[in-house]
Amino acid sequence: QTGQAVQASFGYYIFPLVAIIFGYIFKGERFSKIQIFAILCAVCSIVTLGFALRLVPTFSLIIAVTFGAYGLIKSFTKLSSLESVTVETMVLAPVAFSFLFFNYSLQGQENYTAIRPDFWLLMVSGLITGGPLILFAFATKNISYATVGILQYINPTLQFLVATFIFLEPFNTWHAFALIFIWIGIIIYSGESWRLELRR
């Protein structure tokens, strides 16, 4: 709504790197040389996107660091996935509802049954978001945080494909190179993680 959609999507590309760094610093996770190469491929994709978008990703970094910290905290909590998401929802729901009603009141729309459809879509989107958050919380407790990070490239990549092929947004050579680097990194990292798991 503020014209920062590109930076927002860029932030979700940076987040996996933040998750990997946090896993290394705060959870003592270590990587094989092959995994380090995969991580460097991901770094190359971020640099490539930066050149493609020609921007200083201030908002992107804020999104990446805050969501990375959120996931790290989740990985240390003792609550189950469902319990932790339920607590978060109970705390944030009143704030979200108050903001929505206040915002629409400022627009002179006190009759909420007559509010345009996007208001109700926002209300329902919270329920739809709950499922992925529960699965995310489950993942942070059951696999390494670095692996959580590298798998997070799937989400922005799918968003990117939707934007390109459904919304017909521009797709250039820089974007293609970035996607190639990202998926090379994902395949190498996942393959190496699977190999190491079989050796244990």
Describe the residue ranges of each PLM region.
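C-terminal-most transmembrane helix of multi-pass membrane proteins
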Residues: Y153, T157-R200
